[in-house]
Amino acid sequence: MGKDTIANIITYIRNADINKKGMVQLPFTNITEKIVKILLREGFVENIRKHRENDKSFLVLTLRYRRNRKESYKSFLNLKRISTPGLRIYYNYKKIPRILGGMGIVILSTSRGIMTDREARLEKIGGEVLCYIW
């Protein structure tokens, strides 16, 4: 596991999605827990469970799939890392982008914690853009 935990979360979820795995096991950190709770609240993930093994904690996610006639199961989860450790990107609350006209979400790290773009606009605070999810 590298230094960029958010990129690792996105990579774990994207790889599980590509390989049609129903579950993803993520190393537990406070940032991971907050981002995963946002995914659950917004309906991108079905279930979260905390798992402990050999003095290490993990979060186990159950990914959400929809049924399609042509393919048996199709995911509708797309993630993109925006702000990286080498290039931080900050937005004022007025300039936070809308993903797919409001269908997707932007996860921000603000002075009041990690939140979605809608919550940040309501509280009128900006912050560092962590990732886009649609």
UniProtKB/Swiss-Prot annotation:
GO biological process annotation, one example: translation
Location(s), subcellular: Plastid, Chloroplast
Keywords, sorted A to Z: Chloroplast, Plastid, Ribonucleoprotein, Ribosomal protein, RNA-binding, rRNA-binding
Entry GO CC: chloroplast; ribonucleoprotein complex; ribosome
PANTHER family per UniProt: 40S RIBOSOMAL PROTEIN S15A
NCBIfam families, per the entry: PRK00136.1
Membership in a protein family: Belongs to the universal ribosomal protein uS8 family.
Quaternary structure annotation from Swiss-Prot or TrEMBL: Part of the 30S ribosomal subunit.
Protein name per its UniProtKB record: Small ribosomal subunit protein uS8c
Organism of derivation: Phaseolus vulgaris (Kidney bean)
Gene: rps8
